[in-house]
Design a protein with these regions (language model features):
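Small-residue-rich hydrophobic transmembrane alpha-helices
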Residues: 59, 70-129, 133, 169-185, ...
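Signature of the first transmembrane helix
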Residues: 12-21, 33-95, 266-289
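Small-residue hotspots at the loop-to-helix junctions and early N-terminal turns
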Residues: 67-78, 152, 156, 294-309, ...
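Residue-level hotspots within the lipid-embedded alpha helices of multi-pass solute transporters
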Residues: 48-52, 85, 125, 129, ...
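Transmembrane alpha-helical segments of integral membrane proteins
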Residues: 202-203, 398-399, 424-433
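Short alpha-helical transmembrane segments in multi-pass integral membrane proteins
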Residues: 2-44, 98-164, 191, 195-269, ...
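Helix-terminus/linker motif at the lipid-water interface of multi-pass membrane proteins
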Residues: 52-71, 139-146, 204-213, 272, ...
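Transmembrane helical elements of multi-pass membrane transporters/channels
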Residues: 39-58, 158, 192, 225-229, ...
């Protein structure tokens, strides 16, 4: 269906079509929605787990090479993650935009958003790679350990070769997920774990008489896995199965209008800025950890790595909820969107509680995946109860913020997240950990307190949201025609 085709037949104006859709909304089959959401969540979790596992695989292998290797990779990843996560988070605007376009049955518009996303991340990958090559200045500032700095610089420069393919993969993955196409992404993500593990082992330790590359083999393995993902997904979904044709009108430079770019950036901009500011704060948190010793740096890397894996497991419901909320809002179905939001909340709480119990019962076993150092394990166990508490609170907070993101309401999440991490988490970590001598535990006490505040604010904002108004805005935005970029699309800027 072309972008200029009417999406809701029988009415001429965007406003009247939206009002008609809202008035005629069908009842929601809760059982069917639950199973559909769960199936989507399972596949999103598997693909997200696979993506996060690529980083954790590096940590697991490097942790067995020694504390210096793990600390170097951790510090390098902490600083390189600032710009990369910013661009990647900006690309998640595709979930909202493609999801709403798909829900409005405007496939061509979903393809346009993908094109814009690919161009934006390609342009932004250049300064990100430059940042990777200049990381030595920040590492010198972070630690006095010359060996850690040297290893960290090598790690970051090799890893720079993975920037562009990882961003392209993110765009294509989110594009297909917003349409409900999950299985290929899950399969590719799962296979990439095997590729990363095999590449890490062979490149670090060698095989068939070859001695391997040692430390340098780990980032090189990540580069190989990063290229494997987009090549495999594009080859299967686009070149072979041609799944994109249902939401793709072909490359069209005329689609890159200033108004569309503004709509994209009005969603991507706050999310990207929030991610960069938050990750910069996390990097500053690593400086606090550095003041407590290299063992604390390594322990924090282990705890953060475990949190990432647990996040991947519960995020399935968060991402699936965001996608389905965007779909239903784009289709003009606020009642269904609200039901999906509630289902996502209940399922997330249930999943997080199970994961928290499992994490507590397994105790040191999970941490031994990263290191066998007894001193390191004791540090990790010291903060395990605080870590589990923070994880549970943050999981619910992220779910609610994802619902707001599905509506396109990203400004409030960006401001709250940015201010809370700088004005609450960091001061608590520094004064508690360094000034008051509470040590490593203070870092995670800061996380808990910050997440309680964020959860409270996001819950308040969501409780006051007019779902019908959000659906009408989404329908209006996704009904914009290519002949009227300064009309309806211009009006949508205040909502994006």
């Amino acid at each position: 269906m072309g972008e200029s085709s009417p999406l809701l037949n029988g009415y001429k104006s965007g406003a009247s079509r939206a009002q008609y859709a809202l008035a005629k909304e069908a009842d929601v089959n809760v059982a069917d929605e639950f199973w559909a959401l769960t199936w989507m969540a399972l596949q999103v979790s598997l693909s997200t787990f696979a993506r996060i596992a690529l980083i954790s695989v590096d940590s697991a292998f490097l942790g067995h090479l020694g504390t210096s290797s793990l600390a170097a990779a951790s510090l390098a990843s902490t600083w390189t993650n600032v710009p990369l996560a910013g661009v990647w988070s900006g690309a998640t605007a595709l979930v909202t935009l493609c999801g709403q376009a798909w829900g409005a049955k405007n496939g061509d518009l979903a393809g346009v958003w993908l094109q814009i996303g690919l161009v934006v991340v390609t342009v932004m990958s250049v300064p990100v790679m430059i940042w990777y090559w200049c990381i030595g200045l920040l590492l010198d500032f972070s630690t006095d350990d010359a060996e850690v700095v040297q290893l960290g610089v090598r790690f970051a420069r090799i890893l720079s070769l993975s920037v562009w393919p990882s961003l392209v993969y993110a765009c294509v993955r989110l594009y297909f997920q917003s349409m409900g196409i999950m299985s290929p992404v899950t399969v590719v993500g799962t296979l990439s774990i095997g590729v990363a593990c095999a590449a890490n082992y062979v490149l670090i330790f060698g095989a068939f008489g070859w001695g391997g590359l040692g430390f340098d083999g780990s980032p090189m393995a990540t580069v190989i896995a990063a290229w494997f993902q987009p090549i495999s997904l594009i080859s299967y979904c686009i070149l072979y199965k041609k799944m994109h044709l249902q939401a793709w009108g072909g490359w069209d430079l005329s689609a890159f209008t200033p108004d569309r770019l503004k709509i994209f950036m009005n969603i991507a901009g706050p999310v990207a800025a929030n991610s960069m500011v938050s990750n910069l704060a996390n990097s500053a948190l690593t400086l606090v950890a550095a003041k407590l010793g290299s063992d604390v740096i390594a322990a924090n890397a282990v705890i953060s790595g475990l949190w990432s894996l647990l996040w991947a497991l519960f995020w399935g419901y968060g991402s699936a909820t965001q996608i389905r909320v965007a779909n239903y809002l784009g289709a003009g179905r606020p009642k269904a969107a609200r039901v999906l939001g509630f289902l996502g909340f209940v399922c997330t709480v249930f999943t997080v509680v199970l994961l928290a119990i499992a994490t507590f019962l397994l105790r040191e076993t999970l941490f031994r995946l990263y290191s066998n150092d007894d001193a390191l394990l004791q540090l990790c166990m010291l903060v395990q109860p605080i870590f589990i508490t923070g994880y549970m609170i943050e999981s619910v907070e992220i779910l609610i913020s994802s619902i707001l993101a599905g509506m396109g309401e990203v400004a409030v999440t960006a401001w709250v997240s940015s201010l809370s991490v700088w004005l609450l988490e960091l001061p608590i970590a520094y004064f508690g950990g360094v000034t008051m001598g509470l040590g490593f535990s203070a870092l995670w006490y800061g996380v808990c307190i910050m997440e309680v505040l964020k959860l409270s604010i996001f819950t308040f904002v969501l409780s006051r949201t007019d779902w019908a108004e959000m659906a009408e805005r989404a329908v209006t935005n996704m009904e914009a025609t290519s002949d009227s970029d300064t009309g309806i699309e211009q009006a949508s800027l205040q909502y994006a």
